[in-house]
Swiss-Prot record:
Residues 86-95 have a biased composition (Basic and acidic residues). Residues 76-95 are annotated as: Disordered. It comes from Deinococcus radiodurans (strain ATCC 13939 / DSM 20539 / JCM 16871 / CCUG 27074 / LMG 4051 / NBRC 15346 / NCIMB 9279 / VKM B-1422 / R1). Keywords: Cell cycle, Cell division. This is Cell division topological specificity factor.
Length: 95
């Protein structure tokens, strides 16, 4: 309920967020830009693999800001070349 029992203490969460803000500042990247990129990546992944459990995390690696993508690809969601070609044709407007 309200995220209180998720196992992370607010002190740890606050520390992680502060580290990310400092990393954004060092890299001269606006935090909103990284969050928008994260959301766009998730949207694209969901387009191709709608049933997979995917997440994109923003982490600090030294002085670098790193986006880590974890994409779960289920066998049933993989398309054959023929299905992909059919999808491409249906996306094109008819002349």
């Amino acid at each position: 309920m309200f995220g209180w029992f998720k196992g992370r203490r607010s002190k740890e969460t606050l520390k992680d967020r502060l580290e990310l803000v400092l990393a954004y500042d060092r890299a001269k990247i606006a935090p909103g830009k990284v969050e928008a990129l994260r959301n766009d990546l998730l949207e694209v992944v969901q387009k191709y693999f709608p049933s997979g459990n995917s997440k994109v995390e923003v982490e600090q690696d030294g002085d670098k800001v790193v986006l880590m993508a974890s994409i779960s690809i289920e066998e049933a969601s993989l398309s054959t070349e023929e299905e992909s070609a059919a999808e491409d044709k249906s996306d094109k407007p008819s002349a």
